[in-house]
Amino acid sequence: RYLESHGFEDIREAIPMDYCSIGLLPTNKMGQYIHQTIRTFNPNVVLIDGEPLLTHSLRISHPNIKIAVLLNPADVRNDENDKESMDYFNTLYACADLAIVHGLRKITDNGTYRDFVSTNTILRPEIMSVYHKTSKNIYCVLGGGTVNVGHQFAASTMALAELCQQAAVLMSDYTMHIICSSSNIYDAINENYTPNNVVLHSHVLNASDYYNDACLIITRSGRNTLSELAFLGIPAISVITGDDYRRKEQTQNLKAINSDNIKAIPTNIDLVEFVALCKKLVDTSCVQRTFIPGNDTAIRKILSM
């Protein structure tokens, strides 16, 4: 909206040729578009969400523009990745004037950054206005990682969806909503037997559509969703899924959050045990909000540039 107010209405979306396994390519059409937009707009600050290659390219081509980069703690410090890879990523991210690392765990500067702050996760504005009320709705949020991922991660996503479908049969008093973020996952789930109390959503819903009336959220252990649940205090089951890299990061997230209303399970949990845990959690109340988002800290740092 800010760009549109200044005459930039042609906001483009990246296509597969614009990115690789470590982010946007500054040398393809989207990269060219970003560089051209910056030259035309001439901003005081450029804010980048990750994107190591693009951060490096912008520093080379626009040396006088202030750059702030938003990072996950695992982008800066990750023992599961080899040292050479982390050295490379950190060197590219350190081209920015400011690094804002936001997540569920705090880390310290490794000495390569110009200006560095580690804070709690930055939450979406709509999360702040969620008004939660009691209901009989359980939401399984399959969420991120369902597009352009490996077979192992997609398989674990399907396993979680099937587990919730089976659980719904034993929880007839509740409505089980399964939220898919890609058509391939939705189509695969839709081929299974679907009980009457299961609702399949083919696309991502607005946060208020499920947080407002969920008695329980079932999701994988990603940084953003766990942070939102910690802030809202909604009972949740967090599933550790995916490849070794993602499982390690998710385990770190759960350890850092240490919340009584969020319980972790493996994808191979017994159905009866899973249903028992669901019933136990839906009978609990939302806990008091103790998680303070990192939004204000991030804004203050950017304004001080």
Where are these regions (language model features)?
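Nucleotide-activated sugar donor-binding and catalytic core shared by glycosyltransferases
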Residues: 1-174, 184-305
